[in-house]
Amino acid sequence: MKSVESLTEAEAAEELTRLADEIAAHDIRYYREDAPTISDAAYDALRRRNDELEAAFPHLIRENSPSLRIGAARAEQFAPVEHGVPMLSLDNAFSDADALEFDARVKRFLRLDEEVAYTAEPKIDGLSCSIRYENGRLVRAATRGDGRVGEDVTANVRTIGEIPQKLHGQAWPEVIEIRGEVYLGHAEFAALNEAAASAGQKTYANPRNAAAGSLRQIDPKITAQRPLRFFAYAWGFVSAPFAQTQWEALQALKAWGFRTTPQSRCVKGAEGLMEAYREMEAERPHLGFDIDGVVYKVDRLEWQQRLGFVSRAPRWGIARKFPAEQARTVLEAIDIQVGRTGALTPVARLTPVTVGGVVVTNATLHNADEIARLDVRVGDTVVLQRAGDVIPQILRVIPEERPKDSVPYDFPHVCPCPLRTEVVRETTASGAETVVRRCSGEFACPFQRINHLLHFVSRRAFDIEGLGEKQLTAFFERGWIKAPADIFRLHEKRDELLAMERMGETSVGNLLANIEARRTIGLDRFIYGLGIRHIGETTATVMARGYGTAAHFLEAMDKVAARDPEAVEELDALDQIGGAVIEAAAAFFGEDHNRAMVEDLAGQLTILDAEKPKTDTAVAGKTVVFTGALERMTRDEAKAQAERLGAKVSGSVSKKTDIVVAGPGAGSKLKTAAELGIQVLTEDEWLEMVGS
């Protein structure tokens, strides 16, 4: 990566655009989907790079800059709640120097020579929540959302025992928004995951994801079953002042019935900030819940008001982040996992070690090249890190502790499946080798088959509830389900199902009913469910609309496999279809066993024709962007409606955009549309235009 100083303006603009898109995608995964894919440290590095570029090229700051945005927009399944006072985030500090500079900035701004009093509070790693009380009674609760508009989770919050339905005492303001963190302790998290695993359900990667997923359930009864906890630490809108300092406010929150972090303390000056950080870092492993830093706040509220805010964060507070926790352990073995498409992934099996309050027993090694780079071997003592307290990874080997009989790891040349088929290294179209090694056995490989079946029943494919990894593996090992079509013959095994442990009349009946409900399926889901490489959800939808019927699709794929020029040209002409998709489709349908599997499956189903996009509507051929909160339909419904009417839906506004449909909470996209002179419609105007 080039240094900021060496970048041209064009290079900086290009990188800022990429960073904005990348950070926005990670914000959605973290705040809305509760499923982050990178570590906190990696995310912070992206933001720091963005900030450095904007500092060097301030004229390139865009409306959608991550430095001007908080969190992610609310999910459509929750009603919008506008916060009385925005829920802002804090700037981060990563070193003593950063924290000292924060103290110096505060003193410069306030023109003080005296030491400033601060509160130092543990930064809880959970889901931020704002709870509104009127006349002492809980009336509404919302997630952070994008900082201005959050998600209504009132019914779910009412099920959390540590959140009072009525404030204690009497000295509370008439209206107040209490802010805090919903979280799960380590013991509760372990129990929740153990119960989920026993029931064959998906487990959570960490307590933060579990807390967020539990709070954002559609059914409050599910939330009520989760042992969620809550720490209060701040407030938003308040009808009358109730404290003169942050410390006094924390004591008031306790008096009103909330739990506050017992580790919080009041400190003086820069020395106090350093001492509080060191003490909390030492206490961290013993707390029983996750914290990822220390929050410093100017204690005196009058000074907080004077300091005010800059961009998306207050001047009076900062979050001093902990480095990712590390631990030493022994690599006992390297196992090879085989994915749905045959990719071999090495997994390190470790002597159990506690990192960040979680017992870690394995870590991904990614690929053969990574093993070679680390020169990691069985028996090595390694330094392990739960990166961002999310994904365990091996940082390095401690060579001086390596056993004398150690030998370099030899990546397998045959698949670990019973067939022992050859492993081949993937190459690009130009012939260059990639890091991926694949089993050449395809569906003959049982490991690929079980992962293919898991993809087939997944939510975005056939969405068969009750068929998780545990159940599918058990049915596969018994020989009942070897291919997708076998799922629809499972009713023939009803007696055998009832004889299985934990499979009573109700659970068997529900499972078979769920399977029957998926005998009728849309062509797009059918195509996606086949699990063909490079054919994801969007591509499957494009292909379904392009071919219209299952018969046309299957006939065309046979011809593509035979390299029929007209069939290949027809596929290539579809929007977003390129060479990788054509090659993958040809390879898949060129295998007799794949073709037999597809025909067997199609014989069990009623595959609905895809609805052809219309060409004679007011929006046919136009590019539409939906932004803000939609009140009469979900975002997915709006997208599907627009595409049925022949429009193309985009996630960003550009010169190619024809229409922007803006609801409450529309932000930078609306401003960009105005600057570019793009037609802007309300939701009602859009529905009137399309005749709905």
UniProtKB/Swiss-Prot annotation:
Zn(2+) binds at C415, C417, C439, C445. CDD domains: BRCT_DNA_ligase_like, LIGANc. It comes from the Bacteria. Its cofactor is Mg(2+); Mn(2+). GO terms for molecular function: DNA ligase (NAD+) activity; metal ion binding. Keywords: DNA damage, DNA repair, DNA replication, Ligase, Magnesium, Manganese, Metal-binding, NAD, Zinc. It holds the Pfam family BRCT. One of its GO terms (cellular component) is cytosol. The active site is at K123. InterPro entries: BRCT_dom, BRCT_dom_sf, DisA/LigA_HHH, DNA_ligase, DNA_ligase_AS, DNA_ligase_CS, DNAligase_adenylation, DNAligase_N. Its EC number is 6.5.1.2. One of its GO terms (biological process) is DNA replication. Residues 614-692 form the BRCT domain. PROSITE patterns: BRCT (PS50172), DNA_LIGASE_N1 (PS01055), DNA_LIGASE_N2 (PS01056). NAD(+) binds at D40, A41, A42, Y43, D44, S89, L90, E121, R144, E181, K297, K321. The keyword Aminoacyl-tRNA synthetase does not apply. It catalyses: NAD(+) + (deoxyribonucleotide)n-3'-hydroxyl + 5'-phospho-(deoxyribonucleotide)m = (deoxyribonucleotide)n+m + AMP + beta-nicotinamide D-nucleotide. The keyword Zinc applies. DNA ligase that catalyzes the formation of phosphodiester linkages between 5'-phosphoryl and 3'-hydroxyl groups in double-stranded DNA using NAD as a coenzyme and as the energy source for the reaction. It is essential for DNA replication and repair of damaged DNA. NCBIfam families: dnlj, PRK07956.1. This is DNA ligase.
